[in-house]
Amino acid sequence: MGFLVLLLFSLLGLSSSSSISTHRSILDLDLTKFTTQKQVSSLFQLWKSEHGRVYHNHEEEAKRLEIFKNNSNYIRDMNANRKSPHSHRLGLNKFADITPQEFSKKYLQAPKDVSQQIKMANKKMKKEQYSCDHPPASWDWRKKGVITQVKYQGGCGRGWAFSATGAIEAAHAIATGDLVSLSEQELVDCVEESEGSYNGWQYQSFEWVLEHGGIATDDDYPYRAKEGRCKANKIQDKVTIDGYETLIMSDESTESETEQAFLSAILEQPISVSIDAKDFHLYTGGIYDGENCTSPYGINHFVLLVGYGSADGVDYWIAKNSWGFDWGEDGYIWIQRNTGNLLGVCGMNYFASYPTKEESETLVSARVKGHRRVDHSPL
């Protein structure tokens, strides 16, 4: 192992006493320096050690090495064509030994046809005009203390449950001042059982929470990354919501109207959005523009929008994912906004939803005395 580390530092032009962490240096490697089979094999061994990979046999390891090499070549080619320093970067993250097809099967849902869900939700949604006059230049709910730490969904396509709990956690924290981690496992067990589907939507979670008097905390109903029998009736203490709203792009919508709706909503609270995430496989940072998105109509994942910003004139959303803090920007992805595309990047404008919750009496009393619910001054 020591030899491999020294080889890596030598190829990077770094000393062995460099303060750059092994994890970060692997992600930020200039892969043009790793072109021979021997160099790639040595890098693979270092990557395996970093991520604790152990394969069943030599055949499996050889297969994973070949995939790792193909991914390395793809990363090198894509990074060489980045449009600006702020464009998204790819790297040898923890998914570097699986193919795009394996990644989709393991971490994403089966593609969803959003048209039927839009028809169903349109029957329930409240029609209203959204406007957002003079919004702050940037916004980040993480700085307001209403976002729990990044979680890891494991090898299953249940991003919908994590996006839903994240939205409820934030709504509850904004309304009560109490940030608590909620149970994705309860949603996995109970929503899937009641819906008869393993391909859920975030709004189905909100409906279930409303109908069953709340959602359990993660401590009371911990995550197991597999479905089980619903135990909701055994949990007494619940976090409740008062309703939910949907943001749906209709045939009459314009890109500007959709942007206004999202801005208006996110300044009130984080929102859950659906997206085609196949191209998130090797993302390590920067503003994702969706140029290689396979289909804006085939939704297969859900993330939580927690804010927005801009870099050198390029606007982006800040989205919390559920693949652990060691993916992307410490578990987050920046997704370009104001692209001029009505559908948004990878279809994210199609279908968004968020729970609603009234403020507690304590916070209402404080606001009456002159304290605003949320300070919307620029961050």
UniProtKB/Swiss-Prot annotation:
Protein family (similarity comment): Belongs to the peptidase C1 family.
Keyword Repeat belongs to the record: no
Glycosylation sites (chain numbering): N70, N292
Site (described: Ancestral active site): G200
SUBUNIT field: Homodimer; disulfide-linked.
Keywords, ordered alphabetically: Disulfide bond, Glycoprotein, Hydrolase, Protease, Signal, Thiol protease, Vacuole, Zymogen
GO biological process per UniProt: proteolysis involved in protein catabolic process
Gene Ontology MF: a single term: cysteine-type endopeptidase activity
Function text: Probable thiol protease.
Range of residues in the leader sequence: 1-23
Catalytic site: H301, N321
Protein name per Swiss-Prot or TrEMBL: P34 probable thiol protease
Disulphides: C190-C230, C293-C346
Organism (species): Glycine max (Soybean)
Propeptide position ranges: 24-122
PANTHER family, per database record: CYSTEINE PROTEASE FAMILY C1-RELATED
GO cellular component: extracellular space; lysosome
Entry's EC annotation: 3.4.22.-
Modification after translation: N-glycosylated on its propeptide.
SMART domains associated with the record: Inhibitor_I29 (SM00848), Pept_C1 (SM00645)
Cell compartment(s), UniProt: Vacuole
Lineage: Eukaryota, Viridiplantae, Streptophyta, Embryophyta, Tracheophyta
